[in-house]
Regions:
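Hydrophobic residues in well-ordered beta-strands that form the structural core
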Residues: 8, 39-41, 85, 127, ...
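Glycine-rich tight-turn/loop motif centered on a GG-T
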Residues: 56-62, 93-105
Length: 223
C-alpha cells in the first residue's frame, strides 16, 4: 500500500530548529495526516545548531544539548511522532585526549535527562550505531546497548540500520536477534545509499529475522 509514514529532519524545517514552535509542529503533523501519512518521528537531530554534542566535556555545552534534545522531544510529540533516531556521528565523536569511559558516562547523562521528557510525552530516543568511518563512538549494536543500559530508561532504546550493520563483523540477522529486546526502530537503507534490494545486501534473511523477533514497528527507507 506504499509508504505509511514519514520521518523528518528538524533542520529541513528551519535553519535553527530551536525556532520551531509546538504549534508549527502540530500543523506539520496535521499536514502529514491530510496526505494519509503519519509522522513517525525525527532523525538527523544534531545537524544544527552545529556546536551541540553528546559526549562533550564542556558542561555548558552539554546543558545546551540537553535543552535542545528536550525541545526536539516536544516538537516530535506535537507532530504525533513516537521516535527520535539519534545518529549525528560528528556530534558524538570522542576526542583522542578524553577518557572513553568518562565520555560514555557524559553521553548517558545527556540521554538520561532527555529521556525523562521523552518518557513523559510518549517518545522513544532510538540510539543508532554507525560505522567506524563515520564516528568513533557507538560503532556496534552491542556497544550501543551498553550505553542504553547505563541510561536505564524505557524511553532510550536501539535503532538498527542496514548500512551501519553491514560494517559489523556479525551478520545482520544475528545482530537483529541478539538485540531484539532493545530495538525501537529500523532503517532498511542499503550500503549503496539507495533503497533496499538495489545493492548486494540480501533482504530476505533480514525480513525473516525481524519476523522471528516479532518486530511490529516501522521499517523506514532512508535514501
Amino acid at each position: 500500500s506504499g509508504y505509511q509514514g514519514v520521518e523528518i529532519a528538524p533542520f529541513t524545517l528551519k535553519d535553527d530548529p530551536r525556532e520551531i514552535s509546538e504549534k508549527e509542529a502540530e500543523e506539520i503533523g496535521k499536514d502529514a495526516a491530510s496526505s494519509g501519512l503519519e509522522v513517525v518521528g525525527l532523525h538527523w537531530l544534531l545537524v544544527k545548531p552545529s556546536w551541540l554534542h553528546l559526549t562533550t566535556n564542556d558542561n555548558l555545552l552539554r546543558k545546551d544539548t540537553i535543552i535542545f534534545g528536550k525541545h526536539l522531544v516536544q516538537i516530535c510529540a506535537a507532530m504525533g511522532g513516537k521516535v527520535m533516531v539519534w545518529g549525528s556521528p560528528q556530534q558524538r565523536n570522542i576526542s583522542p585526549d578524553w577518557d572513553r569511559n568518562e565520555a560514555k558516562k557524559r553521553a548517558a547523562d545527556v540521554l538520561s535527562n532527555i529521556s525523562e521528557k521523552a518518557q513523559e510525552l510518549g517518545v522513544t530516543i532510538a540510539m543508532e550505531p554507525l560505522a567506524k568511518k563515520e564516528t568513533n563512538f557507538l560503532n556496534s549494536a552491542e556497544e550501543t546497548i551498553d550505553l542504553i543500559k547505563l541510561v536505564d530508561s524505557p524511553a532510550c532504546q536501539l535503532h538498527l540500520d542496514v548500512k551501519a550493520m553491514s560494517d559489523e563483523t556479525k551478520s545482520i540477522p544475528e545482530i537483529i536477534k541478539d538485540s531484539h529486546n532493545y530495538i525501537a526502530h529500523f532503517h532498511a537503507n542499503d550500503p549503496n545509499l539507495r533503497g533496499p534490494g538495489t545493492g548486494d545486501v540480501k533482504y530476505e534473511p533480514i525480513v525473516d529475522a525481524l519476523r522471528s523477533i516479532e518486530y511490529d514497528k516501522y521499517i523506514s527507507v532512508e535514501v
